[in-house]
């Protein structure tokens, strides 16, 4: 009897945790589905790449290295261009 009283809540807790994990996994797979690109994010990345590469070229023409401070928000200066980290 005592074993049954312990087993029922334990099984219920495991079931709830398993269901929650399955729902999270399904949500992640839908977000990462191939063929559904985030075009707005790609446009921002493209603009940032152009903007940073132009600013790096301006710095290079002045015989100075690219300012690393120009590249922010997950970007770093590499090969005289800002690239996404």
From Swiss-Prot:
Residues 23-48 form a propeptide. Keywords: Disulfide bond, Neurotoxin, Postsynaptic neurotoxin, Secreted, Signal, Toxin. Disulfide bonds join 52-66, 56-77, 71-82. Its main location: secreted. It is found in: Secreted. One of its GO terms (cellular component) is host cell postsynaptic membrane. Residues 1-22 form the signal peptide. Expressed by the venom gland. One of its GO terms (molecular function) is toxin activity. It comes from the Eukaryota. SUPFAM superfamilies: omega toxin-like. Belongs to the neurotoxin 12 (Hwtx-2) family. 02 (Hwtx-2) subfamily. Postsynaptic neurotoxin. This is U4-theraphotoxin-Hhn1p.
